[in-house]
């Protein structure tokens, strides 16, 4: 019962906190907008040639392209989470997964499932996460989660 209740609560909190997202509004994440510009020549080259470029001029006057975007053949976590996050999309999914990840970690440490809900909520709703979601540091959130 606790797992279903915890996941449902995390889902409801995420949906409630980012309610404007579900009305069609978009959070203008600055770093995501910058990434799209830096990534455009990489995507264009990948589409035209079918290969990943080794260099890009789209950031800092030129740098290795793998630092911005690279297509690895097997990205199990990204593919698994990607399917789930399509239900809510970013930013609500980032908040949801941060709470779920903390709750699962607490369970592994032997914390009572009901008790673990409170610190998981606190972790997901911490100021730091909400600030970096707004800034568009999505990969940083995935790394922390």
PLM regions: where:
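Membrane-interface coil-to-helix junctions
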Residues: 11-102, 109, 121-145
